[in-house]
């Protein structure tokens, strides 16, 4: 099968040589202000597009951090960053002071040096909900300023029904908490107490939601609760234990998957079993829905499976391994950006989904193709607009790909200078006649027409030369003015 041409990109790779704190990356996140945060095995690096600023802990720095290895980052509704370290401790980085805050130390009676965080979620009202194993759930609040984080409420584990097994918070500030004893709780926005909605035979493992309901999935059933009043409807499962659930906002449908590979759709007050055409996954581990209503199924098999409700069929995608033999990575992810759906597959495989061809195409990582630039075991990736950030297991470091929406042609200058830096461009300008003027570090000035053919070259300027060209400007008469470094 002929491969599609991948999107044209401009690539850049960053490592410790460029200022990153470590080349092993555990998470990548682009925040609401455009900064890129990179969690590494030795601290956090923040990239502003030009330089890295690193955050970590060293002996004697009085930092509250208990570990220098970071594994995840998220952002609350006020723009503050929340980090999880390797020992499952959680910290807030105040965006204004750029100082870490030990949030769990605010919880009375909790040893902030010895605990394990299991869930950290943000609502839309400045609240962050943190579940602590064996203790309960803390709700923290903050503001869009330099003020420190505060604790708003704490919900004890015995009152909730044991340790938290799944949690969901909405933008309005409501929280839905499922616990080990099979209890489903709801905490309304701003409230200090939890309301028990029902009890289930097995503890819940996941939540999803649509505009009207919150769905709580257990091995035996799906509990549907009204967002406004919390009224509960039980939807019994099938023969095999349920293992995944997702809401598709396009078709307004909720899907559930099972351990034996069955796929269900919520239909009225029951789970209706689907029988798609194609090879059925052996065991469904996760479900995700994209902006076109396609459901992506993660199973025990390498790769990923597409379920299309419009055609009611499965299609499995898998790439040949192109990484080290000892790579093990069972996390999958789909994300949309640059007009494309990006897919990180189970075990190995990374690419974008071509909707017209119904294929997951490799992204510069097929060793059989001449454009291959990287291996295909991606540790983490993040995409925002037309910029894709990723890190591969083998090459390490941080790779940036700027997706070009319009085709671009790259050409080099035919310099006559023996200086290897003579082609380094320092000034660009397009004049009123559509010609592109290029000034170089070595003092060359060249104009190109619309066909990228050189139509003018600045003659030699004596023994001293032109000097490094740093600025170009056209005046109202069409004259071109050249600014140099030290030569006028």
Question: For the regions a protein language model found, what residue spans apply to each?
Answer:
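Carboxylate-rich, polar loop motifs that coordinate divalent cations or form catalytic acidic clusters
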Residues: 1-488
């Amino acid at each position: 099968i002929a491969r599609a041409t991948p999107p044209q990109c401009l690539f850049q790779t960053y490592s410790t040589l460029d200022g990153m704190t470590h080349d092993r990356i555990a998470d990548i996140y682009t925040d609401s202000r455009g900064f890129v945060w990179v969690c590494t095995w030795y601290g956090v690096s923040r990239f502003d597009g030009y330089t890295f600023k690193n955050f970590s802990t060293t002996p004697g720095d009085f930092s509250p951090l208990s570990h220098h290895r970071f594994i995840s980052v998220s952002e609350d509704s006020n723009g503050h960053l929340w980090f999880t370290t390797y020992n499952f401790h959680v910290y807030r980085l105040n965006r204004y002071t750029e100082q870490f805050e030990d949030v769990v130390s605010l919880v009375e009676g909790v040893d902030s040096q010895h605990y394990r965080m299991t869930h950290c979620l943000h609502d839309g009202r400045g609240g962050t909900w943190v579940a602590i194993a064996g203790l309960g759930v803390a709700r923290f609040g903050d503001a869009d300023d330099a003020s420190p984080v505060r604790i708003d409420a704490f919900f004890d584990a015995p009152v909730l029904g044991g340790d938290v097994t799944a949690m969901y918070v909405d933008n309005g500030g409501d929280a839905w908490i499922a616990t080990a004893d099979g209890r489903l709780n709801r905490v309304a926005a701003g409230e200090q107490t939890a309301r028990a909605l029902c009890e289930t035979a097995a503890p819940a493992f996941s939540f999803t939601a649509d505009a009207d309901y919150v769905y709580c999935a257990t091995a035996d059933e799906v509990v549907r609760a009204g967002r406004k009043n919390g009224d509960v409807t039980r939807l019994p499962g099938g023969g095999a234990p349920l293992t995944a659930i997702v809401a598709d906002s396009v078709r307004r449908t909720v899907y559930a998957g099972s351990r034996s590979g069955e796929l269900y759709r919520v239909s009225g007050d029951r789970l209706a079993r689907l029988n798609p055409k194609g090879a059925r996954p052996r065991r469904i581990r996760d479900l995700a829905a994209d902006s076109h209503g396609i459901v992506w199924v993660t199973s025990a098999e390498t790769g990923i499976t597409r379920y299309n409700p419009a055609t009611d069929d499965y299609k499995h995608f898998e790439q040949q391994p192109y990484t080290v033999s000892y790579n093990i990575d069972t996390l999958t992810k789909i994300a949309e950006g640059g007009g494309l759906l990006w897919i990180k597959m189970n075990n190995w495989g990374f690419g974008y989904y071509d909707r017209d061809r119904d294929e997951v195409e490799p992204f510069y990582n097929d060793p059989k193709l001449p454009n291959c630039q990287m291996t295909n075991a991606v540790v983490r990736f993040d995409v925002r607009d037309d910029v894709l950030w990723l890190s591969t297991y083998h090459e390490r470091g941080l790779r940036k790909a700027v997706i070009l929406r319009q085709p671009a042609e790259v050409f080099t200058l035919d310099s006559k200078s023996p200086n290897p830096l003579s082609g380094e461009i320092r000034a660009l300008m397009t004049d009123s006649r559509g010609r592109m003027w290029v000034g170089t570090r070595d003092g060359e000035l060249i104009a190109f027409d619309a066909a990228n053919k050189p139509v003018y070259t600045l003659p030699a300027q004596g023994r001293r030369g032109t000097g490094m060209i740093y600025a170009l400007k056209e005046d109202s008469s069409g004259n071109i003015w050249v600014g140099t470094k030290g030569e006028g």
